[in-house]
Design a protein with these regions (language model features):
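Cationic, amphipathic, low-complexity segments that mediate targeting or membrane/lipid association
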Residues: 1-10, 15-21
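Tyrosine-centered aromatic motifs in long, intrinsically disordered, low-complexity repeat arrays
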Residues: 4-7, 58-59, 64-65, 70-71, ...
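Short Gly/Ser/Thr- and charged-rich N-terminal loops/segments
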Residues: 14, 23, 36-40, 48, ...
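Hydrophobic alpha-helical targeting segments used for export or membrane insertion
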Residues: 25-35
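Short, Lys/Arg-enriched N-terminal segments with co-localized hydrophobic residues
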Residues: 82-94
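Structural preference for beta-rich elements and adjacent junctions enriched in aromatics
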Residues: 94-312
């Protein structure tokens, strides 16, 4: 039976639950004084956190409207169940977390195709991009994973995909989201401006930046050329192949690719981010995310549902 620790927030009651390794399993949280201490601090976006028993309780008045979130350091999952008395409904807010391992740039292979082996040697774990948030409309769920590392001045992404059909017709700054596409959205500077870095299975990509979905600025060709890309399917465009395929992609994204900011180093930063897999024009259309999205229809431009990405 689920046991909740409730506290009154005026018009809302929030209940903290534990999401164990992706399984919707509620566990009792005997946080006691930790809850009071976290609430007293009233930190913004993870500040003012108090630890006890491997759990971290934080009271965030800004981003969650006065909700309590608990982060389990072992499973790296967060779940906050909120009951809005006014709307008389329950809303689950989940914030996952990835810790990106720092790898000395001198240890990174010159050949991008050798980077997966380097990440293996460094023990960098995969994270499932497996949340099918709209299963009724789009039931197909390919197997997709990503792992993240960094060199201080660049983010290293390695995607691994198994799907029933693949396509790569778009070119750089084209409609890559209509192909077999992996996407990385992030807020690198904490100012509300987020970037969408989208890349199809042939390494053709686009980068957009802005504070909202409309009127986004596209990165110039010169910026795209700074992002190193490797795909196990090659770099040439191809029409849809309706046959099961397994493919991998590596992206090395320099800080300069975040063209609306001047980011010196990622080391020690914690940012908000989400990872996606889509294929708008594929026979098996799908929309998957790493961190869950609670919206009625597919929409990846939703920073309120980003998880956390911390760079060692």
């Amino acid at each position: 039976m689920a046991e909740f620790l409730k506290f009154n927030l005026g018009q809302k009651f929030c209940a903290v639950s534990h999401l164990a390794c992706g399984r919707a399993k509620f566990l009792p949280l005997l946080l006691g004084a930790c809850l009071a201490a976290g609430a007293a601090e009233g930190g913004h976006d993870g500040s003012g956190l108090t630890e006890c028993g491997g759990l971290t309780a934080g009271f965030d008045q800004t981003e969650r409207g006065g909700q309590l979130a608990c982060f389990d350091q072992t499973t790296r999952c967060v779940s906050t169940a909120c009951f809005d008395q006014t709307a008389n409904r329950k809303k689950d807010v989940v914030m996952k977390k990835i810790i990106a391992k720092h790898i000395d740039a001198t240890k990174m292979p010159a050949e991008l195709s050798d980077i997966p082996a380097r990440l293996d040697a460094e023990g960098v774990a995969y994270n499932a991009i497996g949340c099918n948030n709209w299963p009724e409309a789009f039931p197909y769920t390919p197997k997709v994973e990503v792992r993240v590392a960094h060199t201080g001045d660049a983010i290293v992404l390695h995607y691994r995909v198994e799907e029933s059909t693949v396509q790569a017709e778009a070119e750089d700054n084209g409609k890559v989201w209509e192909d077999s596409c992996c996407e990385f959205f992030s807020i690198p500077a904490g100012d509300g401006v987020y970037y969408n870095i989208e890349c199809n299975c042939a390494g053709q990509m686009l980068i957009g930046g802005g504070a909202e979905r409309k009127n986004r600025e596209r990165a110039a060709k010169e910026v795209l050329e700074t992002v190193k890309r490797w795909s196990s399917l090659g770099r040439e465009p191809f029409a849809e192949k309706a046959a099961p395929a397994s493919w991998q992609m590596v992206m090395v994204i320099p800080a300069s690719a975040f063209f609306k900011h001047h980011i010196g180093s990622f080391t020690g930063k914690t940012i908000r981010a989400n990872f996606y897999k889509c294929g708008d024009r594929l026979k098996q259309q799908h929309y998957l995310s790493w961190n869950p999205i609670d919206l009625p229809r597919p929409n990846f431009h939703c920073p309120e549902f980003f998880g956390e990405l911390t760079f060692e």
